[in-house]
Amino acid sequence: MKTSITPGEILLKEYLKPLEISQNAMARAVGVPPRAINEIVLGKRAITPPMSIRFGAFFDQSETFWHGIQVECDFRSLAKEKKSLTKGITPA
């Protein structure tokens, strides 16, 4: 079963491909190594707050837009682990 969509998939399918922007061109434009963009696209690297600010500037969006997508993805991934993370914790 496929996991939920990643921020990198959104970046590639909804932004880079439709706008005909290569990963290398985006990397140059936002001042990061091409490998950083490629690893985000492949789901091997998270979008950090500094990267979210860069992406927001590049796509003329909120600074927090991409970070918000990353946080949502992180919480969806953790949903499977919720029981083990909260086992033995009693609410105050």
Predicted feature locations:
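Recognition helix of helix-turn-helix/homeodomain-like DNA-binding domains
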Residues: 31-47
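Short, charged recognition helix plus adjacent turn
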Residues: 67-92
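Short, basic-rich loop-to-helix N-cap that marks the start of a DNA-contacting helix
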Residues: 44-57
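Short alpha-helical "recognition helix" segments of helix-turn-helix
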Residues: 24-27, 55
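A short, Lys/Arg-rich alpha-helix, primarily the initiator
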Residues: 1-21, 68
